[in-house]
C-alpha cells in the first residue's frame, strides 16, 4: 500500500465511523493527509488516539443521542460503520438501518454537507456475472445486509433532495490486500484505489447524490461507472497481477453462487434459524 498524499487543502475535522473494522484500520492511516483532525469511531475497541491529529470516540450507531454528539464539529463524514456481513435482520437493524438514519439526521442538525456512504455491491448482488449494469440499473439486493445498504442509498437521496446534504455512495466491491477467489478478480478494489476514490468523493463539487462502483481497473468488470464520471475517478491497480495465484485454486462448480451471481455466496445466506 502506497503512502497517502494529497495536494488538496485538508479539512479541519473528518469523521470516520467503523474505524475498528478491516477497512477502517486501513483508512485510519490513508486518510491522515485529508484532515487536521481525524475523529475515529466504532462500537468495538480501537487503538488509542495518536497525537493531536486523532480523536477516538466509542459510539453505538443505534444510539441517536450518542451519534449526535459524535457528529458535532465535523466537516464531512465517511460512514463505514455498521454490520458488514450477512446476519439476522434484527442484528442489522440497529447499526445499519437506524444507524444510517441517525448519521444523516445528525449531519442535518449540525450542518454537515458532505457524506461518503460505504454502500456495497450486495445492493445489486442478484444480477448474474454475465450482465453489465450501471448505477441506474434497478437494485437487486442479495441479503439483509444488501437491503440495509439499499436503504442507506435511499436515505442519502432523500437527505439531498430535502436538505441539500450531498453524498457519494460507494458500492464497494471486494477491498482486500488481494483478490481471494475468481469472483474477486472482477470485484477487487485495492486499498490505494479506495483512497483515490475517497479523495475524489470528498473534494469533487456538486455531487448531489452520486452512486459509484468501488472497483479497481480489473480486466473483467460487471459495472459501468459512466454516471459517476464527474468524480474523475481513475483507478490505477488491477487484479490481473494475481491471476496465476487465483487460477491455481480448485475450480468451483458451475452452479456455485460464487460463479453465477455478482453478489456471490451472499445470495445463499440465511434465513437464520429457519430449517
Curated annotation (Swiss-Prot):
> Pathway it acts in?
Carbohydrate acid metabolism; D-galacturonate degradation via prokaryotic oxidative pathway
Q: Which Gene3D superfamilies does this UniProt record tie to the protein? A: NAD(P)-binding Rossmann-like Domain (3.40.50.720)
Q: Which UniProt keywords apply?
A: NAD, Nucleotide-binding, Oxidoreductase
Active site: residue positions: 145
What catalytic activity is recorded?
A: beta-D-galacturonate + NAD(+) = D-galactaro-1,5-lactone + NADH + H(+); beta-D-glucuronate + NAD(+) = D-glucaro-1,5-lactone + NADH + H(+)
Q: How does activity depend on temperature?
A: Activity increases with increasing temperatures between 4 and 42 degrees Celsius. Activity is below 20% of the maximum after exposure at 37 degrees Celsius for 30 minutes.
Name the EC number(s): 1.1.1.203
Return the Pfam families for the record.
Epimerase (PF01370)
User: What does the record give under GO molecular function?
Assistant: nucleotide binding; uronate dehydrogenase activity
Q: Which top EC class is named for this enzyme in its record?
A: oxidoreductase
Q: How does activity depend on pH?
A: Optimum pH is 8.
Positions bound to NAD(+): 22-23, 42-44, 60-61, 80-84, 149, 175
**Where on the tree of life does the source sit, at the highest rank?**
Bacteria
Q: Which residues bind substrate?
A: 84, 120-122, 174, 183
The UniProt record lists the keyword Oxidoreductase: yes
| Similarity annotation | Belongs to the NAD(P)-dependent epimerase/dehydratase family.
- Subunit structure and binding partners: Homohexamer.
Q: What does this protein do?
A: Catalyzes the oxidation of beta-D-galacturonate and beta-D-glucuronate to galactarate and D-glucarate, respectively. Cannot use NADP(+) instead of NAD(+) as cosubstrate.
- Protein name, please? Uronate dehydrogenase
Species of origin: Pseudomonas syringae pv. tomato (strain ATCC BAA-871 / DC3000)
Amino acid at each position: 500500500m502506497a503512502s497517502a498524499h494529497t495536494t488538496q487543502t485538508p479539512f479541519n475535522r473528518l469523521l470516520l465511523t467503523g474505524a475498528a473494522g478491516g477497512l477502517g484500520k486501513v483508512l485510519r492511516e490513508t486518510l491522515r493527509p485529508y484532515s487536521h483532525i481525524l475523529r475515529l469511531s466504532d462500537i468495538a475497541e480501537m487503538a488509542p488516539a495518536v497525537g493531536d491529529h486523532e480523536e477516538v470516540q466509542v459510539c453505538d450507531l443505534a444510539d441517536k443521542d450518542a451519534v449526535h454528539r459524535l457528529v458535532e464539529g465535523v466537516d464531512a463524514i465517511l460512514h463505514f460503520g455498521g454490520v458488514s456481513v450477512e446476519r439476522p435482520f434484527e442484528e442489522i437493524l440497529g447499526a445499519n438501518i437506524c444507524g444510517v438514519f441517525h448519521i444523516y439526521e445528525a449531519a442535518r442538525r449540525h450542518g454537515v454537507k458532505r457524506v461518503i456512504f460505504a454502500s456495497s455491491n450486495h445492493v445489486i448482488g442478484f444480477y448474474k456475472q454475465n450482465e453489465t449494469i450501471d448505477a441506474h440499473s434497478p437494485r437487486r439486493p442479495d441479503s439483509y445486509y444488501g437491503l440495509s445498504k439499499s436503504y442507506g442509498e435511499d436515505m442519502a437521496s432523500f437527505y439531498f433532495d430535502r436538505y441539500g446534504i450531498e453524498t457519494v455512495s460507494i458500492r464497494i466491491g471486494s477491498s482486500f490486500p488481494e483478490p481471494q477467489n475468481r469472483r474477486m478478480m472482477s470485484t477487487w478494489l485495492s486499498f490505494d484505489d479506495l483512497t483515490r476514490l475517497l479523495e475524489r468523493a470528498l473534494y469533487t463539487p456538486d455531487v448531489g447524490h452520486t452512486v459509484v462502483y468501488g472497483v479497481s481497473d480489473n480486466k473483467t468488470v460487471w459495472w459501468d461507472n459512466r454516471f459517476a464520471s464527474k468524480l474523475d475517478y481513475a483507478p490505477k491497480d488491477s487484479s490481473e497481477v494475481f491471476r496465476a495465484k487465483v487460477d491455481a485454486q480448485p475450480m468451483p462448480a458451475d452452479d456455485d453462487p460464487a460463479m453465477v451471481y455478482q453478489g456471490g455466496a451472499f445470495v445463499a445466506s440465511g434465513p437464520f434459524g429457519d430449517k
